[in-house]
């Protein structure tokens, strides 16, 4: 079976780390053990520096990061990760499990920030071409639930400190995009943890078995 790229998406506090662990466990039970893990922004030395710039509220002092500058930093980090880590791993037969990818930008910057969606799509296509994840698990939570969980973890980053309205717009865009793309599977992450884990196991298992069919 050809190696695949699986991405886990969702608002802050959606449970992406737990979901990743369930995905890994499920794939291993299906006989897939050669995997690497990525996060966005980040995953390379350059991309991690960009992550610090875009998420650390103190990284640029009092200077305000403009919405378009934010988008371009995300894409700079993304293309570096894709070209130097993800594509080589896939070519080597290694599965890639990612914490966020381009759907985050389409939702957060397109929905939350209100940046023109055509511009974002054009930028995506120019930077990534036709490269897309094979499977995306979108963990759907309300901002109220997600941010409560995120705040319980400790200090919030620059984006996590945005308003509920911002996250409501982001969630709405996530749901809109998920409804348009069959490769995106929505998981109700407001359920009890065991139910969420079961839904992830079932989705991944069925998807992998369909690949073998």
Curated annotation (Swiss-Prot):
Its job: Catalyzes the reversible phosphorylation of deoxythymidine monophosphate (dTMP) to deoxythymidine diphosphate (dTDP), using ATP as its preferred phosphoryl donor. Situated at the junction of both de novo and salvage pathways of deoxythymidine triphosphate (dTTP) synthesis, is essential for DNA synthesis and cellular growth.
Comment block on domains: The LID domain is a solvent-exposed domain that closes over the site of phosphoryl transfer upon ATP binding.
Family from the record: Belongs to the thymidylate kinase family.
Catalytically driven reaction(s): dTMP + ATP = dTDP + ADP
CDD domains reported in the protein's UniProt record: TMPK
Protein name listed in UniProt: Thymidylate kinase
One GO CC term on file: cytosol
UniProt xrefs under InterPro entries: P-loop_NTPase, Thymidylate_kin-like_dom, Thymidylate_kin_CS, Thymidylate_kinase
Pathway terms, separated by semicolons: Pyrimidine metabolism; dTTP biosynthesis
Organism: Escherichia coli (strain K12)
Quaternary structure and interacting proteins, as annotated: Homodimer.
Gene that specifies this protein: tmk
Species lineage: Bacteria, Pseudomonadati, Pseudomonadota, Gammaproteobacteria, Enterobacterales
């Amino acid at each position: 079976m050809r190696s695949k790229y699986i991405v886990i998406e969702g608002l802050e506090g959606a449970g992406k780390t737990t979901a990743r662990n369930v995905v890994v466990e499920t794939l291993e039970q299906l006989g897939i053990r050669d995997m690497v893990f990525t996060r966005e922004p980040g995953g390379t030395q350059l991309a991690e520096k960009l992550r610090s710039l875009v998420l650390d509220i103190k990284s640029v002092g009092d200077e305000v990061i403009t919405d378009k500058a934010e988008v371009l930093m995300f894409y700079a980090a993304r293309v570096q990760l894709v070209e130097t880590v993800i594509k080589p791993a896939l070519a080597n037969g290694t599965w890639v499990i990612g914490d966020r990818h381009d759907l985050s930008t389409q939702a957060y910057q397109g929905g939350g920030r209100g940046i023109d969606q055509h511009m974002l799509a054009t930028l995506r296509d120019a930077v990534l071409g036709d490269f897309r994840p094979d499977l995306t698990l979108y963990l759907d939570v309300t901002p109220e639930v997600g941010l409560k969980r995120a705040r319980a973890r400790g200090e919030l980053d620059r984006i996590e400190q945005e308003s509920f309205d911002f996250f409501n717009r982001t969630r709405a865009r996530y749901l809109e995009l998920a409804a348009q793309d069959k490769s995106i599977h929505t998981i109700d992450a407001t359920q009890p943890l065991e139910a969420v884990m079961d839904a992830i196991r079932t989705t991944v298992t069925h998807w992998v078995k369909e690949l073998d069919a």
